[in-house]
């Protein structure tokens, strides 16, 4: 992958799961049951990213009905759409982060960068679709 000239917007997943500001700790814990999920994106009805919540943010929270948004943060978890993919890749490896929300200049959520477990590149829409289709269906 030629990351030098590419931007975050060119590689981001464009339809990441979004959670409303009313999402609770318990709801996000349930979302994190999927081991491929590393971050929950809390997004206002107008599309503005309010928080990025990671597992460690809620690990010690004893109140399952607590609103989750105040437990997350944006700093260090977002990148601008025009950011150099090579620079973002280096920063994610240096910090150990595998997810970064991609935002517009005014804070709207545009997408999500998902660093592969191999750390050699980013997941594509096709990768995510294939993984979803390969999951067994649970019948109740």
Which ranges hold each PLM region?
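Tandem CBS (Bateman) regulatory domains
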Residues: 1-15, 49-97, 105-140
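Acidic (E/D-rich), amphipathic helical modules within compact regulatory domains
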Residues: 17-61, 69
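Sensor-regulatory modules in signal-transduction proteins
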Residues: 42, 102-103
């Amino acid at each position: 992958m030629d990351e030098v000239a590419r931007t975050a917007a060119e590689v981001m997943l464009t339809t990441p799961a979004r959670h409303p500001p009313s999402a609770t700790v318990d709801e996000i814990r349930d979302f994190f049951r999927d081991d491929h999920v590393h971050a929950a994106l809390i997004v206002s009805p107008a599309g503005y990213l309010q928080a990025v919540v990671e597992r460690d943010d809620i690990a010690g929270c004893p109140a399952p009905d607590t609103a989750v948004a105040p437990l997350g943060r944006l700093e260090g978890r977002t990148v601008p759409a025009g950011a150099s993919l090579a620079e973002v890749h280096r920063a994610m490896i240096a910090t150990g982060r595998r997810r970064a929300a991609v935002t517009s200049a005014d804070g709207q959520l545009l997408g999500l960068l998902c660093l592969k477990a191999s750390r050699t590149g980013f997941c594509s829409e096709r990768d995510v679709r294939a993984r979803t289709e390969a999951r067994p269906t649970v019948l109740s």
